[in-house]
Amino acid sequence: MIHTLLRWVFQRLYRIRIEGDSSQFQQSKLLITPNHVSFLDGILLALFLPIKPVFAVYSSISDRWFMRWLKPYIDFVPLDPTKPLAIKGLIKVIERGQPVVVFPEGRISVTGSLMKIYSGAAFVAAKSGATIIPVRIDGAEFTPFGRLAGVFKRRCFPQITITYLPPTTLPMPEADSARTRRALAGEHLHQIMMKARMETRPQHTLYEAFLAARTRYGRRSPSIADISFNEDSYQGLLKKSLGVSRILQRFTRADEHVGMLLPNATITAASILGASLRNRIPAMLNYTAGAKGLQSAMKAAGIKTIVTSRQFLEKGKLTDLPKQVSEANWVYLEDLKDTVTLADKLWILFHLLFPARAMLPQKPDDAAIVLFTSGSEGNPKGVVHSHDSLLANVEQIRTVADFTPRDRFMSALPLFHAFGLTVGLLTPLMTGARIFLYPSPLHYRIVPELVYDQNCTVLFGTSTFLGNYARFAHPYDFARLRYVVAGAEKLSETTRQVWQDKFGIRILEGYGVTECAPVVAINVPMATKIHSVGLLLPEIESRLITVPGITRGGRLQLRGPNIMKGYLRVENPGVLEAPAAENAEGELQQGWYDTGDIVELDEKGFCTIIGRVKRFAKLAGEMVSLESVEQLAVKVSPEAQHAASAKSDSSKGEALVLFTTDSQITRDVLLAQARSSGVPELAVPRDIRYVKALPLLGSGKPDFVTLRHMAEEPVTNASEQSA
């Protein structure tokens, strides 16, 4: 009677929605593993699960007075994590055929993300052979019974969804000791819980996800600021997005690729959202690529209109670009202000009240944005991402990293770069964190000052950028940082060590590619391995393809929800080339993306980058990693910059060339270091060329195309070469 009454009350108050197959609970041995977001979770499961389970409750809670009142209505087993016999008792309950509910996190989430997973629940599942049914509870975290005060906007009676995920099992891992087996089982259960979160993520477009974040965190919550230091709330950003969308549709058509040549600024974020909600596809142009690069991008993606700013062109010394790329229809944001009519203002006002009505019909799988590869190894390619692939990557990041609305992101990497767009804009926007957009990562003195001034807690960049920030920063500038993430190039040991010594901060290295939106793997506080790029993100499938001549690792191929829709190439303008890769048997399989990177995956799944297939030189039949040549030079001269390339050689096929900013490096010094490091002499270049600075791309990566051309050029000055 009481059970029925409470179920009716909760159904009316919280509009409980049940998703998933309830028939799967008829297993003989059953372990139910829900996430834990509020004090309501146990009551919700007791009322709405299709079976009557036994709850495993920590003894510190089961001994409290209110649990005595619940005892006649809810079966529970006290669980003392300090006593191994308690785990054995739980296994016996399952073996008797009684379904058991265990909260693997052991506590209510204080971040909104998954907390640490205790291995006890995994050991119970593996030892008993029970079927695991993951359950997701969404919405209860917004109630006053959650522990997210100040993180989410509290609501008394939000809608709560309970999702039953497909059943799975967890075999006992093979290991030498019981402790190791238990730890491995816990890691497997963590993977199951992360997969459950990913499978229940909402299917939205970018604009719908933005509106959902606006509702979740509050429309007046501070959201985004730029170098003007004027901070916009979610409502302020919505207003600007609606204004851009209204005007943009006058000179563009639906499904058109609209070029955007804009700096890191609030208006750029508004332009992306504004174009998206009216079915225009922003094509983020690299303003460091020059006229030739812009023309290549325009040809590949069929871009006719470029949105930019006169002020930006003047400050960036790019005023000649419109003349050099005269075939484009250049639209200046400053000129649009005078074109706003009364009808436009009324339209914007109406849709501020009813923002969902502003969006034209579109689906999550529709194209959302065009990014361009760095061009470090050839012509830049247009990479088309859907709404879903971008938001899937955001959710993958949020599943492994505990970002919250308390965080403040310093976003200096350009928004035309996938790293800057997804990690620097979309992730904090969908998390409720505040964003500070800065127009250049190259201002090595200013960025640390702004990190300090804005109380930033999250900073990301390339190894080169982070190393230079460390040079000019005061030891206290980074005192509030929780996450410092390095990507886009290998993290140098010098940079890693200086951050540890000067600031007491561990840099977390990650790995991504534009085609994967971009994050593929990342080290996080919960799972870190030094000199690796971390674990692959949840829901990403991987395989390694053997490459002849390369004995260590294999060529990494990926499949997952964050993979691009396809390429737009200069050679085949306007035609979308869907991702496909050859498997080990040489069969072309759709949906797989070949990264071209040689990696190793250890027994726990940590990924270590060996190098790119294209960054190997073949010397007399032997494959030599150009990155290993660079690392050898770094050990000899850690303060200088080094980049290796290959050149044609009539006797060996190819020969190594080392470009360095250290004029004192000689082959003899490199040979001595190679012998002490166990590096073969074949990997020591004879051609060593001093340069004042390495050619770099806008992302901070070395420009390997230019370096290859430089390597092929004959050495005209004897001082440029040593052997």
UniProtKB/Swiss-Prot annotation:
InterPro entries: Aas (IPR023775), AMP-bd_C_sf (IPR045851), AMP-binding_CS (IPR020845), AMP-dep_synth/lig_dom (IPR000873), ANL_N_sf (IPR042099), Plipid/glycerol_acylTrfase (IPR002123). The keyword Nucleotide-binding applies. CDD domains: LPLAT_AGPAT-like. The active site is at H36. Keywords: Acyltransferase, ATP-binding, Cell inner membrane, Cell membrane, Ligase, Membrane, Multifunctional enzyme, Nucleotide-binding, Transferase, Transmembrane, Transmembrane helix. It is a multi-pass membrane protein. Residues 233-646 are annotated as: AMP-binding. SUPFAM superfamilies: Acetyl-CoA synthetase-like (SSF56801), Glycerol-3-phosphate (1)-acyltransferase (SSF69593). GO terms for cellular component: plasma membrane. One of its GO terms (biological process) is phospholipid biosynthetic process. SMART domains: PlsC. Its EC number is 2.3.1.40, 6.2.1.20. Residues 15-138 are annotated as: Acyltransferase. The chain crosses the membrane at residues 258-277, 409-433. It is found in: Cell inner membrane. It comes from the Bacteria. It catalyses: a 2-acyl-sn-glycero-3-phosphoethanolamine + a fatty acyl-[ACP] = a 1,2-diacyl-sn-glycero-3-phosphoethanolamine + holo-[ACP]; a long-chain fatty acid + holo-[ACP] + ATP = a long-chain fatty acyl-[ACP] + AMP + diphosphate. One of its GO terms (molecular function) is long-chain fatty acid [acyl-carrier-protein] ligase activity. HAMAP family: Aas. Plays a role in lysophospholipid acylation. Transfers fatty acids to the 1-position via an enzyme-bound acyl-ACP intermediate in the presence of ATP and magnesium. Its physiological function is to regenerate phosphatidylethanolamine from 2-acyl-glycero-3-phosphoethanolamine (2-acyl-GPE) formed by transacylation reactions or degradation by phospholipase A1. NCBIfam families: PRK08043.1. In the N-terminal section; belongs to the 2-acyl-GPE acetyltransferase family. This is Bifunctional protein Aas.
